[in-house]
Amino acid sequence: MANPLYQKHIISINDLSREDLELVLATAAKLKANPQPELLKHKVIASCFFEASTRTRLSFETSMHRLGASVVGFSDSANTSLGKKGETLADTISVISTYVDAIVMRHPQEGAARLATEFSGGVPVLNAGDGANQHPTQTLLDLFTIQETQGRLENLNVAMVGDLKYGRTVHSLTQALAKFSGNRFYFIAPDALAMPQYILDMLDEKGIAWSLHSAIDDVMAEVDILYMTRVQKERLDPSEYANVKAQFVLRAADLEGARANMKVLHPLPRIDEITTDVDKTPHAWYFQQAGNGIFARQALLALVLNSELAL
């Protein structure tokens, strides 16, 4: 059966309907249960990381290899013509698109991934993070993990903690969960790092409940998912970073009173916002969450590069 994601650019989580999300998650579950090492055997995929990455880059490239694709690209733009010779992003993408079947791209500038689609010659571009804007594939693995642990994506109480202003993962995840009914959001952040108004306006327009809080303890007993984020030092001036970095820290003792099946998620890397004693609790699920990135990204690559997919 033809699939709606074939040859589609995936730049924002809003490029995917609820039905698209459900298709990706169902495909991820099938690939987790039954690996397909030759599914992309004759495909070449570019992995273009203009910004530092560990989990996203390695997860994407592992996904490509495990599906049998050939992988080309770079993890540091400083040694490319763009970095050394001043080539434009448009020209870089125009050239790369003549070599490959798909482009996975991370870039520090908001909107760079969308710009790349204008110069890719129809070759699908998958956004692996563009500045503080969007991180759709992180959201796919987040949704996959939530569905696995909670058994649903509806009627959830979800708390998001930390840097909600620059944290692209929380922007994308909120927009995705807003496509499913009955979810409620609790936003816990310093005033300087509050959730952007456009996200709150979107929730209001959809009639989705949300509230602002000043402490994790305020909501611990109510939530199904506690989504922690780090304060992003690279996006703040030093004085602002010093003021907010330790404001919201989760310790094992804080989990007393949490629901039995509540899971703590984190897009990683963590710095100081989750102490290591949390790792030993049954609530900690961030390492399993990271592992699910393989299956979510495999699913997306498989769907974007196959007009028909029967697993």
Curated annotation (Swiss-Prot):
Disulfide bridge positions per record: none
Any GO MF annotation of the entry: aspartate carbamoyltransferase activity
Keywords: Pyrimidine biosynthesis, Transferase
Record pathway: Pyrimidine metabolism; UMP biosynthesis via de novo pathway; (S)-dihydroorotate from bicarbonate: step 2/3
Coiled-coil residue windows: none
Function statement: Catalyzes the condensation of carbamoyl phosphate and aspartate to form carbamoyl aspartate and inorganic phosphate, the committed step in the de novo pyrimidine nucleotide biosynthesis pathway.
Subunit (UniProt): Heterododecamer (2C3:3R2) of six catalytic PyrB chains organized as two trimers (C3), and six regulatory PyrI chains organized as three dimers (R2).
Name of protein: Aspartate carbamoyltransferase catalytic subunit
Gene that produces this protein: pyrB
